Amino acid sequence: MRSAAAALSVCVLAVLLHWICWTDRSAELLGFRAADRPKADVREVLVGVLSARHNHELRQAIRDTWLGYLKQHPHFQNRVLVKFIIGAQGCSVPLEDLEDQYSCSQLELSEAAVSGQEMAILSVPDSSALLQSDVPVLSLDFKVLHSVVITQLGVFPNKPPHYLKGNITVRLLQVDQEEAVISARFSSVSPGTAADGMFYKPVEQFILPKGFEGTLLWEAEDSTALMSVNTSALRLNNGGGVLHFRSIEEGTLPHRNALGFPGLAGGFTFTVYDVEVLSEMLRGRSGRQKIREAQLKGEDEALQEESLRHGDMVFVDVVGTYRNVPSKLLQFYKWSVENADFSLLLKTDDDCFIDVDAVLMKMQRRRLTHTSLWWGNFRQNWAVDRVGKWQELEYASPAYPAFACGSGYVVSRDLVQWLASNAQHLKAYQGEDVSMGIWMAAVGPRKYQDSGWLCEKECYVDMLSSPQHSAEELRLLWSRKNKCGDPCGCS
């Protein structure tokens, strides 16, 4: 009996030793040996997950998949810290009253917009306000915030009043389009009709819908034919808030694709389209505001409850909109250097699948632990958009500096420290990924290119990240990985 018990003890001891060796070997492959395990408050990797306030289902899917795996893993739970990055404030403007869906700018509409009358963007009662242009082409950029119809195009007269010198063409173009939507030609023999200190000609009437972005061009054969106006004391009529004009102040830098210099050589008249719909919208504004306030209160309460329950959320002092994501990221960088001890920071989004085993293993195998490191999948010579979700009007170059796709990238602590220290001086551009590229261009980090950080919604067995997934898709990818090691499918 004793010999049997002794034999059994030897077997149990052998199995135990084998298990210990296997787990240590697994951890060693990933660079987490027990011998060099740091203190519990020191983390090898800090993961920041950009998350919209309302994306609680995506956050829960991450907690149920790769985040839950990290928390339960004996070698990873004290080496990797994951935090969701949340805007502390929600946008208080109802969706129907926003200028666009990407910001929190409210439509400043007034009763003047529903007058039903034809309006001019300006009048020149005194011809002494006019001055000769020193360039042959002037341009005015504007955006339509509620549908309008342009009825006439106009030019300023030369001195003396009611005289036009040379030939002038006025064209309205949609941004990034070459063909004119409407146009009119003015000359000394065909100057048009004089009204309010300007010559006007009627044009074919098109409905310019909400969101239309256009450029009005005044073109002359030589600059002496164009008259301009001192814009410093000028206020354009936006029709009660239905139009938004870009800056034409003296000294304004022309946009990189501008066809003319910012300025005015005339104007146009317009009417507001569908006044009845606009009137109804104005009447319902106060009711929508009350509903939105109640929604925000419920959203705040739900977020606080979620934060208390999970303890994995960082609220940064930013209004949670798409346009504010770069500022949101900078605020998280400030939080991270003040509140966490880490060597590397992995940034990702709440709709991204992350193969944490592959990331940590490659991190160790490639020894990606040095300073001035930026590890990601880099886009190069990426064109700057003038319209749409990725519209960028502030960055002057036609292409961005190299930037890593936002689905996942890793930066070393020293770079995070630099970003945090300079956050108040860094300009936020339209997206956090391109903003990061512009900011890092000043530092010149070592870029480690890795196509495993996917830029589009794709799936490969050796991928590190994949973006744009639903909560259900995140769970499916993770379950496949656990079942057969391939998130893309098990045969």
From Swiss-Prot:
Metabolic or biological pathway, per its Swiss-Prot or TrEMBL entry: Protein modification; protein glycosylation
Pfam families for this protein: Galactosyl_T
One GO CC term, this protein: Golgi membrane
Enzyme Commission numbers on file: 2.4.1.313
Membrane topology label: Single-pass type II membrane protein
InterPro entries on file: Glyco_trans_31
Gene3D superfamilies associated with the record: 3.90.550.50
Glycosylation sites: 167, 230
A molecular function (GO) term: UDP-glycosyltransferase activity
Predominant cellular place of this UniProt entry's protein: Golgi
Keywords recorded for this protein, A-Z: Endoplasmic reticulum, Glycoprotein, Glycosyltransferase, Golgi apparatus, Membrane, Signal-anchor, Transferase, Transmembrane, Transmembrane helix
Membrane-spanning ranges: 3-23
BP GO annotations: muscle cell development; protein glycosylation; protein O-linked glycosylation
Catalytic activity entry: 3-O-(N-acetyl-beta-D-glucosaminyl-(1->4)-alpha-D-mannosyl)-L-threonyl-[protein] + UDP-N-acetyl-alpha-D-galactosamine = 3-O-[beta-D-GalNAc-(1->3)-beta-D-GlcNAc-(1->4)-alpha-D-Man]-L-Thr-[protein] + UDP + H(+)
Function: Beta-1,3-N-acetylgalactosaminyltransferase that synthesizes a unique carbohydrate structure, GalNAc-beta-1-3GlcNAc, on N- and O-glycans. Has no galactose nor galactosaminyl transferase activity toward any acceptor substrate. Involved in alpha-dystroglycan (dag1) glycosylation.
Similarity comment text for this entry: Belongs to the glycosyltransferase 31 family.
Record-given protein name: UDP-GalNAc:beta-1,3-N-acetylgalactosaminyltransferase 2
